[in-house]
Amino acid sequence: MEGAKPTLQLVYQAVQALYHDPDPSGKERASFWLGELQRSVHAWEISDQLLQIRQDVESCYFAAQTMKMKIQTSFYELPTDSHASLRDSLLTHIQNLKDLSPVIVTQLALAIADLALQMPSWKGCVQTLVEKYSNDVTSLPFLLEILTVLPEEVHSRSLRIGANRRTEIIEDLAFYSSTVVSLLMTCVEKAGTDEKMLMKVFRCLGSWFNLGVLDSNFMANNKLLALLFEVLQQDKTSSNLHEAASDCVCSALYAIENVETNLPLAMQLFQGVLTLETAYHMAVAREDLDKVLNYCRIFTELCETFLEKIVCTPGQGLGDLRTLELLLICAGHPQYEVVEISFNFWYRLGEHLYKTNDEVIHGIFKAYIQRLLHALARHCQLEPDHEGVPEETDDFGEFRMRVSDLVKDLIFLIGSMECFAQLYSTLKEGNPPWEVTEAVLFIMAAIAKSVDPENNPTLVEVLEGVVRLPETVHTAVRYTSIELVGEMSEVVDRNPQFLDPVLGYLMKGLCEKPLASAAAKAIHNICSVCRDHMAQHFNGLLEIARSLDSFLLSPEAAVGLLKGTALVLARLPLDKITECLSELCSVQVMALKKLLSQEPSNGISSDPTVFLDRLAVIFRHTNPIVENGQTHPCQKVIQEIWPVLSETLNKHRADNRIVERCCRCLRFAVRCVGKGSAALLQPLVTQMVNVYHVHQHSCFLYLGSILVDEYGMEEGCRQGLLDMLQALCIPTFQLLEQQNGLQNHPDTVDDLFRLATRFIQRSPVTLLRSQVVIPILQWAIASTTLDHRDANCSVMRFLRDLIHTGVANDHEEDFELRKELIGQVMNQLGQQLVSQLLHTCCFCLPPYTLPDVAEVLWEIMQVDRPTFCRWLENSLKGLPKETTVGAVTVTHKQLTDFHKQVTSAEECKQVCWALRDFTRLFR
């Protein structure tokens, strides 16, 4: 919103429309207009005026939120001499509005906290606030709100205050932490039975624990700690207060993760949590699920904190295994949501025990894990009145999947075979109800693959028993037994006499709609593992493939079946493969031809993606072993299918989704036959370029990268592929030149640099000598700022591989030429690249991208270290040394230390470490 400042009346009207306009389009217009206002420089004055006038809750909330947002994102707009008056104004507003609405108080508290963090001239802000407001009981609630959000905002991603300022703030808050704790004690004394005040005290204390600035020796003997456990032990504590106290205890436990340096507090918390077992049982008896979940969170956090002690000194001191007993008590609760809270701890325990690899230690924990698995098997039971198959996508289905993953991770402590046999014996010896049988089969399916299939009579017996299950058993039992058979495909491979009965059992499932997809998945597994044995059944698989749509399968299951069929097809004799592949593809090709001949307006779906996906999976997994000189058996089939794919692509050229599936299908066709697809190269490239000039689908760039990968080393193809690249670059660059082109088209950036990288890998000299290399590199430099994981990764990989070409394979005859060409490119753009990479790291990209950036800088250094040293020095000179408010972002010593660390690095990871530390100064 540029230009004149809008009137307050206009702002009020927009706020009213946002909240009360019955027309959604009116709300949308108001929201857009107010968003523009918030981004403008007028927002400061307008929001201040709205807060002074206090006309209604809505306008005050908008103004408070705007103030917070402006301070977080646009603080640089204000002159330094206005900061003190802004602070005083905000403190006046929060005092005047303290009774209007809690959400307004929170927004203003955040604004004050964010201001304090960015205002180095406001020294000792905690002391100032406490002195100003602690003696007025009516001001205590908003004072506590400010003191709660202040530590939370220190690590806020919205504020780029830098590591130096952050360190200064944390030291300042640590210095005043005892003042805050004393204030909280005073609040407790004044609160009496005021529950809301107690909740605010606990929230504030938890916030300071989370920042890690409270003195643990001081806190170990503090009355606040005793009060927390007193509240949690009392049966009459309300749900809200209980949650606040639980959150605070969890924060305290998290804060003492380094147990040895916080021993007195660790001991107090440890003893305190152990006293909560009785209170947990009382909550269970009262069926108070909220409190039960809170206790389980506390018990889990206790175990997480003392994990090292539990593993290293089980049963001794802070390794006391009563902690695990508490979690197993929770695992016994009938609601599965309770045990689910502890899953992360059990994963971590399994991980630690796996690394210790100590049989004696493992033996201590075995009984605990067995009890956990029995509890989990019980939690996995469906309701006795459940009808049909188990749901996999609802909350309970997702819980069962997480159980399956956890069991796989912990089974080594019990032993797969021992556990499998125990589970099977419960089915064999008893006559459990169907829901128990199904849950046991589900756990057996989770561990079946980890049981050694060699000469294992129990596995054989289980397989025999399952395939003989009568059709009268509950559908869910049949469903899970089919999944178990699929997981036991290794056993079938070792015992081929079971192949026929197993396939017969699965075929019955395939013919019933509820079981069809599970059966298809199991057949796919059998095909994958028993490829050689399944060759004799190929005709049966072909019959299934021909009538695929009659089986009522999910699209994924149908594709899985075709994948299995293709894997078996690849094991047939070479002379049979061409004919069989043609048969396998013919159903899909006929369907595509039928769609092509249809008039688009007759109401029937003309979407070819199902058939394209099926062809893609067939090409992807038909990978026979072909000796040099032999014609690829799939070549003829793919050449025959090409006209249909080409016509489909042409018909749907404007539809990105369908074109993407066409390209994917062609990609696997090319990969399938490799150099055998040479006859398609010319027509395919011509069609790609023609369509791309009109419709910039990025998948054409990706398909181009596949062609370069397959043919880039063929002398006769290089010029044609370069022509393709140059032709594709023209519309690509035009697309990226549009406003916000990079941000709006990350897929195009990703695929463009995949294509360019393939060129560097397969035919570097061709690209380096071309006219297009400098524009591509310039776009790569511009794209380094793009905060998109895949696109940024592709850009960095291109830059790394491009520069590496100047030093790689120095024994090859084109080495000197490559070295010279890279030298020319770097002379032209090296300084710009280094400056951009440094700026990008400090201001644009998240920390996870730093290893990729470090690799690029490392490669530049390998080409010419002295020149790189100069470039880096120039780049560092261009960085801001102070914030707009005068806080030191980076000192001269920090700059010189970083320069030295990078330029003297002997490994790439040292560059990465230096970057990590340095960029924190700007975050």
From Swiss-Prot:
Q: Name one GO molecular function term.
A: small GTPase binding
Its subunit composition reads: Interacts with (GTP-bound) Ran. Interacts with (phosphorylated) SFRS1 and SFRS2; leading to their nuclear import. Interacts with NUP62. Interacts with RBM4. Interacts with CPSF6, promoting its nuclear import.
Protein name listed in UniProt: Transportin-3
One Gene Ontology cellular component term attached to this UniProt record is:
cytoplasm
Subcellular location(s) per record: Nucleus envelope; Cytoplasm
Q: What is its main location?
A: nucleus
Q: Which organism is it from?
A: Homo sapiens
List the GO biological process terms: protein import into nucleus
Q: Which domain of life is it from?
A: Eukaryota
N-acetylmethionine found at: M1
